[in-house]
Each structure stands twice: as C-alpha cells, then as structure tokens.
Amino acid sequence: LDGVEVWNSRAERKIADANSLAEAFAREHGLRRFAGSDAHVPQEIGHGVTVIQAEACTLEAVKAALLRGGARIQGCRSRAWHTARSQLTKRKKTKAGPVAYAKWAAFALKCCAQDLIRKGDGTDVTDR
C-alpha cells in the first residue's frame, strides 16, 4: 500500500510549497494521499490527520478502505511558536552555548511575528 504524505503541518516552515509539491507528486504517480502532524510538542498533535472511512476497526477493513479511496486529508498549519519551542528543547538537551540561545531568541521572535501575520490566513486543509 504505497502513498505520500501530502499534508505535514510543519513542512512549510523550511520549504514554502512542500505540501503542494508532495500533492503534485502523489497525483502524478497515482499514489494515495496521507497527512501527518509531525508533532514535536503536544499542542501539535492532530494538526494533520488522515480520516479513514472503514467498515470496522480492523487492519483488513482499514486497508480495504484505503484501497478504495475512503480517506480524507484534514489539518492546519502548526503555529511557528511550536517550532521555536521544540528548537529551545533541542538546545537545552545539547547544552548549547550562549550564541545558540541568542540565535534561538531571534528565531523565536520571527516565529511569533509569523504567527501574528498568518493568523486566520486560511491554512486549514480539508481534502484539498
């Protein structure tokens, strides 16, 4: 059962059209479409989901539903602040120095600004 993750709630932080590129690839190659939260903090869980309309909650029923196209993509872009938080955790775990924390502070400010600018920008996706 082959497919492509066409919605990742964090992917567009690094590559602006990452999800669109994945969507185009899936369509071009006739692959099933999936979504993922890529959650690094609890608040991101569920920001990308594949909703499957299966007859029962069994592996066989889920596989059959996916094979017949019984899945929808739902999600929303994760807030930039969550990315900043996960980067702070990374710095703490690696015992980063002051320069790394200064870079993080600048990154965190950028993330906060992005969240303010993008608030309500229509980034929710429902089976696009």
Give, region by region, the residue ranges found by the protein language model:
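Charged catalytic cores and adjacent phosphate/nucleic-acid-binding surfaces used
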Residues: 1-128
